[in-house]
Every structure is written in C-alpha cells, then in structure tokens.
Amino acid sequence: MDNDYGLIKESVIKADSALQTAVNEKDGIRILNQDFFETLISFIISQNKNIPQIKQCVKNISHRFGDEVIGYNCEAFYVFPDVDRLHEVTEDELRECKVGFRAPYIMNATEAVYSGNVTKEKLDALDIEQARELLMTIKGVGEKVANCVLLFGLGRREAFPVDVWMKRIMESMYFDGKDTKKLEIEAFAVKKFGNLGGYAQQYLFDYARTTLFK
C-alpha cells in the first residue's frame, strides 16, 4: 500500500471520515523516502527557521562541503555531504553556513552517526518508541524533530509530528478547540490513525496551512 496513493487516501478517510475534506482538497501529497542523515541534519536546522531559510542553509552546506554533480541539461549542483565528510567540518565552518545556534547540534548529530551510536540500521531494528528515544539522545533533537526524522528519513509511516499548525488543527477538529498538550495529541493520533499517521498528518498539515487557517 506504501506506493498506492489511491488506496492510501481511501484508507485515511476510512480511518476517520472527518479527514475527507482535507484529503480531497489536497490531492497529490506524497511522502518521499529521503536520505536518513540529510533528513536528520535538515530537521535540526529547521528549528526556528522558515522554509526558505532552511533550504538556504542546506544549500550552503551542500555547496561548501558536498560533491559537485552534473545533472539534467548539464547543470551543475552540489549534493549534501555524507557523514564522513561532514565529520571533518569544524563548528566555525558550519556557522559560516548560517546555521547559527544549531551548529553544535549538527556537530553532535554527525558524531552520533559517525561513531555508530545512532545509525539507520540501529533505528530500523527498534520499535518506534525506542527509535524516537534513541534519536532524542542527540542534542537539539526533541520529540517533533525525532518524529519528522522517523517519518521522512526512516519511512516510519506511523510517526505523527506535531508542530504549531498540527496542534491548532488537531485541537480544532478533535479537542473542541481546547488547549491540549502535544503528547496527548500524539497519543490520540497513534490510536486514531495507526500506521496511517504520517499520511494523515501530511494531509492535515497542508490543509490547515493553506486552507483552514489561511
């Protein structure tokens, strides 16, 4: 079912008919299988930054430390450096890429992966709670970032990241507009959506951001 998005949409709506509007309005949403290490660093960078700023930081790191690749129409671009290359980079060099206070977090995450303490293979072997806890041993990785890495970098489709937007829409749709703790929202989502949590989250997030709270 992972690549059958028609079936996924039907299953999400079946899990909760209240999602029908969100699903129907946002056709074409996909969850891509992204590189684990790049996803981890990107979401560490994402804290307190908007999307253009995040993209620029990732581009800065790629341009400075990544390999040049010739792509479509012979245009050159730079790929994100692997863990071996980024492990050679100093904190000052990272700061020059405009990552700010996140530089030591990136250093810590790189060391964790490079040393073998936190690897994709280890995380894949754990249940989602254990994997989340292991990710959160990295400095600067809280529950939201860990859930994003689980969903986008490790293919754990049951992960349900909760940020400000998700908190607002979940409170609006399921908690009568009452202020609700993120942990309570996450627990509700796990019970409600199960292995479809990541897909439900994406539909709800985009619907809230572009339509419901526009």
Language-model regions, residue ranges each:
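HhH-family (HhH-GPD) DNA N-glycosylase catalytic core used in base-excision repair
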Residues: 1-214
